[in-house]
Swiss-Prot record:
Organism encoding this protein: Photorhabdus laumondii subsp. laumondii (strain DSM 15139 / CIP 105565 / TT01)
Family of this protein: Belongs to the serine/threonine dehydratase family. DsdA subfamily.
Pfam families: PALP (PF00291)
Keywords, comma-separated and alphabetical: Lyase, Pyridoxal phosphate
Residue numbers of N6-(pyridoxal phosphate)lysine PTMs: K118
Record protein name field: D-serine dehydratase
Length: 443
C-alpha cells in the first residue's frame, strides 16, 4: 500500500493505527445483527449443516475401524467441555476484572486423529471427496456400511487420486493423516511458520510435505497451482471452501447437546459467549455459524487473533476483507501462534459472517505463553500458544461496559452467563516442544 493510501485508511478507520502499533485491542462490531437478518448473507442454512452431520454419521463406522481412538465416541470426532474454576479466579486477578458467570473450555485441542479443531473441517472435506469418488465409481452406496472403505480394494481405488492443501500446520495434519489413511496421494504445502514436529508427523504417515520459505498465503497458492497442473488432484481451499466451513459448523448442534447434558441453559437471561481463535477464518467462522443456528441471538461469538496477524479484524473493520492483508499496513505476520499466522483472511468467511460476529480482539505473543503457563499450573491442561488467544476473552468482554450496555447485557444477566473458550490445538504437541512453551511463560 502506498503511504497516501495508508493515511486515507487511518483517517477513515482510526483503529488501524493501533493495529500497526501491535497494540492489544477489542473492537465491538457495529454491523452485528440478528440471526434472521444476517443469515441470508451466509449463503448456507440449517439443511446444509444437517447434511454434513448425516455424512459424518455415515462415516462413523469407517472412522472406528481406521482410527481406533475414535471407537470410544463410536466414530464421532468430538471433544469434551470442562469447567476451569481455578483458572477463572486466576484470570480475574491477572486482568483485574471481575468475571461473573462460568468459564468453560472446549477441548478441540484433544480431538482424536489430529489433535486440533482442524480435525472437524479438514477430515470432513476429505471424507466428502472420498464419498463422492466412491459413489461415482459404483463402489459405494449411501445406505452401505461405510466401514467397507477400510479395505485394500478401496485403498487401491483412492490411490489413483491425489489431494493438495496449503497450511500453517494443523489443517495439513488433519487432511494429510485422513487422506493417507484412505489411500490418497497427498501433498501438504507448509508455510515458513509451520512447526517441525508437525512436518515430521505428516511424513511418518507417508504424506509428501512441501516446505515453503514464505507465509501461509504462498503455501496455499502453491498448493492450488500443483492441483491445477496435476490430473486427478483435488485442492482443498482453506480460504474459500464451503465444505470445510460446514464440517466445522456441525460443532454448534453438538455443543447444544453437550450443554443439555450438563444442564446449562442458554437464553436471553443466560447469555453464551464463545471465544474463537481466528487464522484464515474457516474454523471459527464455521463453528460460529453452527452456534448461531443452535442458539440464535443468545450466543455472542467473538474472534481472537495475534497482534502480529490481525487479518480478519483488519478485513472486517475496514470492509476490505481479502482485498487487504496485514503486510499492507506494515505488520510482519510473524507470531508464535503458528496456526493463526495468516496475513490475508478468507473473503468468503468475512463477508458471510461479519453480521453474525459480536467483535474481535488481539493478544500479544507473550500473553499467549503466560496464559499457557497459567492454565497448565491451575488446571493441568496443556495447549499450544495459538489455542490460548481465546482465554483472554472473558476478561475483555467483562471489562467492556460499552459493549455490554450496547447489547443490553445487565449485571444480572452476566451473573448467569456461560463463557466458552475454544481451545483449538495442542493435544499432540511433543513433550520437548511443550517444555519450551512453558519455559517462555512469565508467571
Amino acid at each position: 500500500m502506498k503511504r497516501t493510501e495508508i493515511q486515507q485508511l487511518l483517517n477513515e478507520y482510526p483503529l488501524v493505527k493501533n493495529l500497526m502499533e501491535l497494540e492489544e485491542i477489542f473492537w465491538f462490531n457495529p454491523c452485528n445483527t440478528t440471526l434472521k437478518e444476517g443469515l441470508p448473507f451466509v449463503g448456507l442454512g440449517a439443511d446444509d449443516v444437517e447434511d454434513a452431520e448425516a455424512r459424518l454419521d455415515r462415516f462413523a463406522s469407517y472412522l472406528c475401524k481406521a482410527f481406533p481412538e475414535t471407537a470410544v465416541t463410536h466414530g464421532i470426532i468430538e471433544s469434551e467441555i470442562v469447567a476451569i474454576p481455578t483458572m477463572q479466579k486466576t484470570l480475574e486477578q491477572h486482568y483485574g476484572v471481575g468475571i461473573t458467570g462460568r468459564i468453560l473450555l472446549k477441548k478441540d485441542s484433544h480431538l482424536p486423529i489430529s489433535g486440533s479443531i482442524k480435525a472437524r473441517g479438514g477430515i470432513y472435506e476429505v471424507l466428502t471427496h472420498a464419498e463422492k469418488l466412491a459413489l461415482q465409481a459404483g463402489l459405494l452406496a449411501e445406505n452401505d456400511d461405510y466401514s467397507k472403505l477400510f479395505s485394500e480394494e478401496l485403498r487401491r481405488f483412492f490411490n489413483q487420486y491425489s489431494i493438495a492443501v496449503g497450511s500453517t500446520g494443523n489443517l495439513g495434519l488433519s487432511i494429510g493423516i485422513a487422506s493417507a489413511k484412505l489411500g490418497f496421494n497427498v501433498s501438504v504445502h507448509m508455510s515458513a511458520d509451520a512447526r517441525e514436529w508437525k512436518k515430521q508427523k505428516l511424513r511418518s504417515h507417508g504424506v509428501n510435505v512441501v516446505e515453503h520459505e514464505l507465509d501461509y498465503g504462498v503455501a496455499v497458492a502453491r498448493g492450488r497451482k500443483e492441483a491445477e497442473s496435476a490430473p486427478n488432484c483435488f485442492f482443498i481451499d482453506d480460504e474459500n471452501s464451503q465444505t470445510l466451513f460446514l464440517g466445522y459448523s456441525v460443532a454448534g448442534g453438538r455443543v447444544k447437546a453437550q450443554f443439555e447434558q450438563m444442564n446449562i441453559v442458554v437464553d436471553e437471561d443466560h447469555p453464551l459467549f464463545v471465544y474463537l481463535p481466528c487464522g484464515v477464518g474457516g474454523g471459527p467462522g464455521g463453528v460460529a455459524f453452527g452456534l448461531k443456528l443452535a442458539f440464535g441471538d443468545h450466543v455472542h461469538c467473538i474472534f481472537a487473533e495475534p497482534t502480529h496477524s490481525p487479518s480478519m479484524l483488519l478485513g472486517v473493520y475496514t470492509g476490505l476483507h481479502d482485498n487487504i492483508c496485514v503486510q499492507d499496513i506494515g505488520i510482519d505476520n510473524i507470531t508464535a501462534a503458528d496456526g493463526l499466522a495468516v496475513g490475508r483472511a478468507s473473503g468468503f468467511v468475512g463477508r458471510a459472517m461479519e453480521r453474525l460476529l459480536d467483535g474481535f480482539y488481539t493478544v500479544q505473543d507473550q500473553e499467549m505463553y503466560n496464559l499457557l503457563g497459567l492454565l497448565d499450573r491451575d488446571e493441568g491442561i496443556r495447549l499450544e500458544p495459538s489455542a490460548l488467544v481465546g482465554m483472554a476473552g472473558p476478561a475483555r468482554v467483562s471489562g467492556n461496559l460499552d459493549y455490554l450496555n450496547n447489547k443490553n447485557l445487565s449485571a444480572e444477566k452476566m451473573k448467569q452467563a456461560t463463557h466458552l473458550v475454544w481451545a483449538t490445538g495442542g493435544g499432540m504437541v511433543p513433550d520437548d516442544e511443550m517444555t519450551k512453551y512453558l519455559a517462555t511463560a512469565k508467571i
